[in-house]
């Protein structure tokens, strides 16, 4: 059965790499004649691109597919991504999914879906990761619901953090060929994209397996005509050398917003997590970045785990104090999720779930307080905004180069354009801005 006149709905969980990979799948299905439909509409095929960082992510994937199957009993349902790759036996038992496939099997998804639409029996296809495997090329020419483009430049992680299942889900570091990245970037620029996000599982590891490095890639991306803003995904602070920082600061097109992975602001907790930096070293990297930018503004975002095994109240308070010290624009706070197959699963002194949730709520409140202080310091300053979601004919949401969320009235402009604005007050969700 061909895909002509058939509809497919995608649901994406997790990181920007998943967004990129979903974009590639959408392109694949669109090329076969399928129509992409949003959530809530009837479809012939439902695909969830899963995230398995937490147990909650697995639960959301299963819940979404159950609902899709219940509301569309004749549809084909697909479970792909990190969940089935990391836990193939568990995912295979989830019978609401007609197709279960891992991260290395995405190129076969369309063919397998067409087989299922023609009456083929249920398919489970999860290929284990292997040493020496190559980067899977999944180019994307446009994204259905985004005005910024995401380019996947690397996959895999060689680290072994005590809490993390991602190396199991993503395999070893594999870097994408530079020529392939630049070719896709030029195509995206020709399609009208002005901002690109370089996404990866371990972004600073780019080039470790190919003899190049991330900063060289950024410098070459900045030479592509039509691309006005380059944004980086998550960075590990221990991999940012002074030379690396200095060279990045010299790239004018690079958005000066750095997502530096923290996980805890307490050094003893970081050691138990098997992170390879201390809180003090993290702060030094932040200082080096600020020094490299001089009087130019720079912002920092991060992730933080609450309730890691062995975390005392004093450790938690130390982590909170560190968040205030750095002055993060945004902190993604989440309670520790106990993942089977990771060293931390068997660690002693597991923190009770109620306490993890309580600490997460407290840290979230603190992070919002710090966010308000950071945004208050930007009132009256000017920046550029990429117009994104239109709220009306003239009102848009968007983000500045610093990743400050704004709402601005921009008559005569449209989504995807970059405009110059003056920042106003924060309303609890976005900063109100005005065209300059």
Which role does the model predict for each range below?
Residues 1-206, 243, 248, 254, ...:
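Proteins enriched for Cys/Gly/acidic motifs involved in redox and nucleic-acid/cofactor modification
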Residues 7, 72-73, 224-231:
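Short, surface-exposed connector motifs at secondary-structure boundaries
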Residues 52-57, 193-220, 224, 236-243, ...:
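Conserved glycine-rich "GG(E/T)P / GGGxP" loop and the immediately following alpha-helix
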Residues 160, 164-171, 203, 229-238, ...:
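Conserved strand-turn element in the central/C-terminal portion of the radical SAM core barrel
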Residues 181, 198, 232, 260, ...:
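Conserved, mostly hydrophobic/aromatic
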Residues 190, 215-216, 223-224, 229, ...:
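Radical SAM/AdoMet-radical enzyme domain recognition
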Residues 210-222, 242-256, 311-328, 353-358, ...:
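Short, electropositive alpha-helical surface patch
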Residues 346-436:
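Terminal RNA-binding accessory module
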